[in-house]
Swiss-Prot record:
This is Glutamate--tRNA ligase. It holds the Pfam family tRNA-synt_1c. CDD domains: GluRS_core. GO terms for biological process: glutamyl-tRNA aminoacylation. The gene is gltX. Belongs to the class-I aminoacyl-tRNA synthetase family. Glutamate--tRNA ligase type 1 subfamily. Catalyzes the attachment of glutamate to tRNA(Glu) in a two-step reaction: glutamate is first activated by ATP to form Glu-AMP and then transferred to the acceptor end of tRNA(Glu). Keywords: Aminoacyl-tRNA synthetase, ATP-binding, Cytoplasm, Ligase, Nucleotide-binding, Protein biosynthesis. A motif ('KMSKS' region) lies at residues 250-254.
Length: 467
C-alpha cells in the first residue's frame, strides 16, 4: 500500500501556524515513506470563503518548501481537488446511505430544533441528542415534505456501537455511539457538511494516514461511522497537540502580540528553511536531540512515534535564533538574491557582510539600509547632549587626516587605531566621539564600516567644521 497523506484547508483565511505544522507533519511522514502528499481545498462553505484564501495557502506552503505531489489543477484519477467541484458525488453517496438505512431526511425548522434542545436541558441532558422523529413518518408524508425542498439529510448513528481507533499519537481512543447525536451530512442548501465530505474525499483520494489537530478528535467517531456504513477501509488517524503562546494558552488568531500567519513571517523576511526547521520541532523531537536539519535530513529522520503528547510552545526567540543562524551561514550572493538594495554592487556586498551576523531576518537588512540610504541631516537633541560632554580631540584629528581621495575601509580603520595610539585612549573614549560626529548616533556596526558605508560625501560634509 502506498502511503498517501493530505492537508485539506478551507479557504476561509490565510495559512495559520497550526495549519502549516499540520501540513508539514503530513508532508514529512509521506516523504519518509516515499509516499505522496496531497493538497486539497475544502471550499464547500461559500459563506466563509475569502478572496485569495486558497492562493495564500498554496503560495505559503511552497515558500516553506512543503511541495504537494497533487493539488488543485492536477490531472489525476484522484481529483478534483476542490469540494465545490464534487457536489454531485456527495449527493449521490448520501442517497446511497438513505437506501441502505444509514441516513434519513429530517424536516425540522430552527424553532423546532431549539425546542428539542430546551426540552432535553430541562431533563438534565446538556449534550444535544436529535430525537429521530422523522424516522417514524410514512413514505407519503415524506414525499409530500420533500416537494417543499426544506430538509437536511442526517446520518443514523448506531447507538449500540463503540467507535474506536488506535491513534498514531495518543493510542487507543473510544467514543460510545449512544453519546453521538444523529448528525447532518447534507445541509438544506444541498452542500455537504465537513464530516461527510472529508470522508468521501479521503476515500476517493486513497488517503492512508491523517495527521491533524486535536480539535478533530470528536469528529473522528462520526467519520468512522461513515467509513463503516460504506464498508470502506478507514485510514489511520493521528491527532496533534495544541501550540501555545508563552503563557501556555492555545495560539489564537485574535492574539495581536504574536504573528499568527505564515504570510506575516514571510513578509518580515524570515528565512524559509529556518522556519521549516523550527516548525518541525513544534511537537516532534529527533532521537539524538539534533535541532538543525535541512529538508532531506529531516525527511530521513522523521518518525511519527516521536510526536509529542504534550502541548508545544511557540517560542519566537527560538525562531529568531534559527533564522539568524541560517542567515549567518548563507553566502553573500545568496542573501543578495533576496534583497533589493542600491545600484552599486560593491557597496551592496560590503553592506551585507557588515550586517549578516547580526540580522535575524531580511527586514533587518532593510532597516539598516534605510539608515545609510536616507541618512539624517543633523544630530538629534539626545545625541547632541551626549556629544557635547565628550572630548573632541579624536574627532579633530580624524577630520584632518581622513583620506577622501582614496576611500578605503582599511585605511579608515587604521586611522582610528592610530588616533587611539597617539592620544593613548581606547574603547568608548576613542570611538564614541568619532561615531557621533560621523554617524549622528551612538550605536551601530563596526565604526570604520559604518563610515565607509555612509560614503565620503556625507562624511566630508559632517566633518567640515572639525578640520
Amino acid at each position: 500500500m502506498k502511503i498517501r497523506t493530505r492537508y485539506a484547508p478551507s479557504p476561509t483565511g490565510f495559512l495559520h501556524i497550526g495549519g502549516a505544522r499540520t501540513a508539514l507533519f503530513n508532508y514529512l511522514f509521506a516523504k519518509h515513506h516515499n509516499g505522496d502528499f496531497i493538497l486539497r481545498i475544502e471550499d464547500s462553505d461559500n459563506s466563509r470563503n475569502i478572496k485569495d484564501g486558497e492562493k495564500s495557502q498554496i503560495e505559503n506552503l511552497l515558500w516553506l518548501g512543503i511541495i504537494p505531489d497533487e493539488k488543485p489543477g492536477s490531472e489525476t484519477k484522484f481529483g478534483p481537488y476542490r469540494q465545490s467541484e464534487k457536489l454531485e458525488r456527495y449527493q449521490k453517496l448520501a442517497q446511497e446511505l438513505i437506501k441502505k438505512g444509514f441516513a434519513y431526511y429530517a424536516f425540522d425548522n430552527q424553532e423546532e430544533l431549539e425546542l428539542q434542545k430546551k426540552e432535553q436541558i430541562a431533563k438534565g441532558i446538556f449534550s444535544f441528542r436529535y430525537d429521530q422523529n422523522w424516522l417514524k413518518i410514512s413514505d407519503q408524508e415524506k414525499q409530500k415534505r420533500l416537494k417543499n425542498k426544506h430538509f437536511v439529510i442526517r446520518f443514523k448513528v448506531d447507538k449500540a456501537k463503540n467507535f474506536c481507533w488506535n491513534d498514531l499519537v495518543r493510542g487507543q481512543i473510544c467514543f460510545e455511539g449512544s453519546a453521538i447525536s444523529d448528525w447532518v451530512i447534507i445541509k438544506s442548501d444541498g452542500f455537504p457538511t465537513y464530516n461527510f465530505a472529508v470522508v468521501v474525499d479521503d476515500f476517493d483520494m486513497e488517503i492512508s494516514h491523517i495527521f491533524r489537530g486535536e480539535e478533530h478528535i470528536s469528529n473522528t467517531p462520526k467519520q468512522i461511522g461513515i467509513y463503516q456504513a460504506f464498508n470502506w477501509k478507514t485510514p489511520k488517524f493521528g491527532h496533534l497537540t495544541i501550540i501555545t503562546d508563552k503563557n501556555g494558552k492555545k495560539l489564537s488568531k485574535r492574539d495581536k502580540n504574536l504573528f499568527q500567519f505564515i504570510e506575516d513571517y514571510k513578509n518580515q523576511g524570515y528565512h524559509s528553511e529556518a522556519f521549516f526547521n523550527f516548525l518541525a520541532l513544534l511537537g516532534w523531537t529527533s532521537p539524538d536531540s539534533q535541532e538543525f536539519f535541512d529538508h532531506k535530513s529531516l525527511i530521513k529522520a522523521f518518525d511519527y512515534k516521536r510526536l509529542s503528547k504534550a502541548p508545544s510552545y511557540f517560542d519566537i526567540e527560538k525562531l529568531n535564533w534559527f533564522s539568524k543562524s541560517y542567515i549567518s551561514k548563507m553566502t553573500v550572493d545568496k542573501i543578495l538574491e533576496n534583497l533589493e538594495l542600491s545600484d552599486n554592487q560593491i557597496w551592496n556586498r560590503f553592506f551585507v557582510e557588515t550586517f549578516q551576523k547580526s540580522s535575524i531576518k531580511y527586514a533587518d537588512f532593510y532597516k539598516n539600509f534605510e539608515f545609510f540610504h536616507r541618512p539624517k541631516q543633523e544630530m538629534d537633541e539626545k545625541m547632541l547632549e551626549i556629544f557635547e560632554k565628550l572630548d573632541k580631540k579624536p574627532v579633530k584629528i580624524f577630520a584632518s587626516r581622513i583620506d577622501y581621495q582614496n576611500w578605503d575601509y582599511t585605511k579608515i580603520n587604521d586611522l582610528i587605531k592610530e588616533i587611539g595610539q597617539k592620544l593613548e585612549i581606547t574603547g568608548k573614549n576613542l570611538l564614541l566621539p568619532i561615531r557621533l560626529a560621523t554617524t549622528f548616533t551612538n550605536s551601530g556596526p563596526e565604526l570604520a564600516r559604518a563610515i565607509w558605508l555612509l560614503g565620503k560625501k556625507i562624511i566630508e560634509k559632517r566633518l567640515l567644521k572639525w578640520k
